[in-house]
Regions:
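Alpha-helical transmembrane segments in multipass membrane proteins, preferentially the mid-helix core
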Residues: 145-154, 213-226, 269-283
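Interfacial loop-to-helix transition and helix-capping segments at the boundaries
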Residues: 47-59, 128-141, 181-213, 247-271, ...
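Membrane-cytosol interface segments of multi-pass membrane proteins
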Residues: 1-176, 290, 294-297, 315-359
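Alpha-helical transmembrane segments of multi-pass integral membrane proteins
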Residues: 212, 239-348
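Aromatic-anchored segments of alpha-helical transmembrane domains
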Residues: 17-24, 125-128, 170-185, 239-253, ...
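Hydrophobic alpha-helical segments of polytopic membrane proteins
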Residues: 148, 155-169, 223-245
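Hydrophobic, membrane-facing alpha-helical anchors
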Residues: 6, 116-123, 184-188, 204-221
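Short juxtamembrane and helix-loop transition motifs at transmembrane-helix boundaries
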Residues: 97-106, 123-131, 191-197, 221-230, ...
């Protein structure tokens, strides 16, 4: 069974749900006079806070799926330059569509902005600063990963490369990024460079590189299609294994996410595919697919709602599951509204053409 674009959308829908959990329930210091009620769980944490911490996996999931889609898209259509230009236009187009609506709303709500105003606005527009919403930080490293995709592809497709060798290189590279580079940058010779914005953005991109490369390798070896086929053949066994592995991932994630989320994400996806092959999974899959279609806009919008614009409204339901569903509904509705607003000019042009043709 082939891993399709629909499957990608469904997984993005899961990832955006994890992102909302992460931002809603992980940072009590960012809540101003509001809170949430959740049942106790493990290690002194509530279930909501545990799921919020696990929700950090969303970054690695989106990054891995980005690498997976990039490899397949470039393999099918060819032309790395065209691919890079097309994906950068898509990424920044989605960002700018929300940005030009968010800035005036933020100013009307008297949200603080950088000074001088125009300089700060230009930096924010280019994705070099995120005064209006820090959760937009993902724009820059993902753009850099897109630009660097040809190098990642050459690594994956190099002569005599084997799956085992590629994954060992990936694990070794991840160890260098997380354990060696920070020590090297502490050297007096490099201390000045280590404090620059350039290094900060570059290092953030490097920390996401293993997940992106993992996606490329999983696409090269068609591992997700193989996982989906296995789930179809051994449904009961895969379902039971997925439940156990997911429970283990949720439990250990607070202790290992920093350096190993590229592995956690690669393990999580086959588990999700196994659960989606059940009746309940098939029932909720269309909802997740719709969420996945709007996942980029929902990512850009939801943090504005829960941190900057209407926090008291978002946390009004009081109970964690209701808060999550409330923000999910509002974010999806706002994303659809953004899509509708930007479709109006095209609809008007189509209507004029139809009227002209009728005459």
């Amino acid at each position: 069974m082939e891993f399709t674009k629909r499957d990608t959308k469904i997984l993005k829908g899961i990832a955006i749900c994890l992102m909302l959990c992460h931002h809603l329930f992980t940072f009590p210091e960012r809540l101003d006079g509001v809170g949430f009620v959740s049942v106790p769980f493990i290690n002194g944490m509530s279930f909501a806070m545990c799921m919020g911490q696990f929700g950090k996996l969303c970054v690695a999931l989106f990054t891995l799926l980005g690498g997976y889609g990039a490899y397949l898209s470039c393999t099918r259509t060819g032309g790395e330059e065209r691919f890079t230009a097309r994906h950068l236009r898509s990424l920044y187009g989605a960002y700018w569509r929300v940005f030009v609506l968010a800035v005036p709303i933020s100013l009307l709500l008297r949200q603080a902005h950088g000074s001088p105003f125009m300089e700060d606005l230009i930096y924010c527009f280019l994705g070099l600063r995120f005064t209006y919403c820090n959760e937009w930080w993902f724009i820059t490293p993902f753009a850099l990963l897109t630009v660097g995709f040809p190098l990642v592809r050459r690594f994956a497709d190099r002569k005599n490369a084997s799956p085992e060798g590629n994954f060992l290189w990936l694990i070794g590279g991840n160890a260098v990024i997380y354990y060696v580079l920070p020590r090297v940058m502490e050297l007096p010779l490099l201390s000045a460079f280590a404090g620059t914005v350039f290094w900060t953005e570059l290092y953030t991109t490097l920390t996401l590189l293993p997940a992106y490369a993992m996606g490329v390798l999983m696409a090269k070896y068609d591992l997700l299609s193989a996982a989906k086929a296995l789930c179809a053949r051994r449904r009961s066994l895969c379902y039971a294994a997925a439940v156990v592995v997911l429970a283990a991932l949720i439990y250990i994630h607070p202790f290992n996410w920093l350096a190993y989320d590229f592995i956690n994400a690669a393990v999580f996806i086959p588990c999700a595919l196994a659960l989606l092959s059940t009746r309940l999974g098939a029932f909720i899959a269309p909802v997740l697919e719709r969420l996945g279609e709007e996942s980029t806009s929902m990512w850009l919008i939801h943090a504005l709602l829960c941190y900057h614009w209407c926090q008291k409204l978002i946390y009004a339901p009081k109970y964690a599951p209701l808060i999550f569903l409330w923000l999910l509904a509002l974010s999806y509705a706002a994303a659809r509204l953004v899509r509708l607003l930007y479709s109006i000019p095209a609809r008007l042009r189509a209507a004029r053409v139809k009227v002209s043709a009728a005459k």
